[in-house]
Amino acid sequence: MANERTLSIIKPDAVAKNVIGEIYSRFEKADLKIVAAKMMHLTQEQAEGFYAEHKERPFFNDLVAFMTSGPVVVQVLEGEGAILKNRELMGATNPKEAEAGTIRADFASSIDANAVHGSDSAASAEREVAYFFNDNEICPRG
């Protein structure tokens, strides 16, 4: 498997529950390195831009409202097969369907307030990382 980068967002519900460190610990135990990170409160414009591909979907406005409801932590994860590994750590989008021990099974409360976002493909990862981070903000850790 190739060394990859992927974008991860700890969403407002998980930040409010104060489980950032527990989620970071899971990344690190899975041999994913955090090579960039920042806490921010997304503006309406930032959230709409990030989720632009969902603009025509019925859940778009609720998603934007939720993602701007409080601070998020955005990070770039790096490692062997990072995209798939992060998706496995997160679990199913709906926490009721997520396997026990996944981030969403343990920390999410609903399909909307589902604790984390992770890139779903190499193309998405590249686009999403670039949306939040300049190259000089990413610190490769070898």
Swiss-Prot record:
Name the source's superkingdom.
Answer: Bacteria
Question: Catalytic residues per the record?
Answer: 117
Chain positions recorded as ATP binding sites: 11, 59, 87, 93, 104, 114
Which GO BP terms, alphabetically?
CTP biosynthetic process; GTP biosynthetic process; UTP biosynthetic process
Enzyme Commission number, as recorded: 2.7.4.6
Protein function: Major role in the synthesis of nucleoside triphosphates other than ATP. The ATP gamma phosphate is transferred to the NDP beta phosphate via a ping-pong mechanism, using a phosphorylated active-site intermediate.
Assembly state and interactors? Answer: Homotetramer.
Q: What is this protein called?
A: Nucleoside diphosphate kinase
- The protein's gene is named ndk
